[in-house]
């Protein structure tokens, strides 16, 4: 793509060229190269029409490019699983089961494509607590109970722990002023993706990156950082046809008005507002309900996974529970 292909008035383009030459001292040909590079970066991928998304005619929405959750009930809700393109957000209160679902997807990604996996590993970026390795090991041991559709010999042959790459990030100051996250997303993650070592990127949680370090008056700077961060995620997802899963926190809702970006029935709303919501392609909400369900010698608080918005999914939900082997939908 060339700079002249952008929909700008010719006088504006000419003024930009003159100003760049004056401010930088570059030659006219160098300025032209700079503008071409900027135009290419700003619009690396063409926009995707919503009609094509609904028809499933775009790369990340092809039926063979879905990442299974590992549960038929939840896969039915998501029409096969997570699309292998764009940002999927799972938000919810503490203890709702968001991290449980993320860990389960990290394991599901390692199965061959015939079992609705991605035949590759995952990158897991922790921004709050330490990585829940003990729970991961339990999920690995119980895979044969969860994935009854997969031959036990195949499950035992997979080295799940060796293909989950864990990155720790503390806060936004460290991430952006010292380039910790930027180095991770612009160097290490693309290298793993290019080598085929990973095919899933998880950020747990995105809200922790932006809520602690900004006051209310810093909303403009926070918005810029959010857009920069999400732009990097979108680029990785589109470049490598990779699902990106972002765990998000929630905030209380005090308004009685109907919020189309919120869950079907809840007094909370995903954090980070409209700026972040506009970057998300699929928004899911996990809620912890009243009551418990029992199975054998196990019991679990009842949860519900809801589709808040998605270009290819109806607003719907399924009850679920967290067992030793992972998150399963509850048949009602």
Please identify what each model-predicted range represents.
Residues 10-11, 15, 19-24, 30-151, ...:
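The Walker A/P-loop phosphate-binding site
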Residues 117-220:
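Conserved inter-motif catalytic segment of the P-loop NTP-binding fold
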Residues 37, 41-44, 80-81, 93, ...:
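Conserved, well-folded catalytic cores of nucleic-acid-processing
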Residues 224-227, 231, 235-332:
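Phosphate-binding/switch region of NTP-binding enzymes
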Residues 95, 129-130, 171-173, 207-208, ...:
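Conserved beta-strand elements of beta-rich interaction domains across eukaryotes
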Residues 3-16, 175:
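Short, intrinsically disordered, charge-balanced linker/junction segments flanking boundaries
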Residues 88, 123-125, 165-167, 245, ...:
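Hydrophobic/aromatic beta-strand patches that form the interior of the parallel beta-sheet core
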Residues 71, 84, 99-100, 133, ...:
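Amphipathic alpha-helical transducer elements in NTP-driven molecular machines
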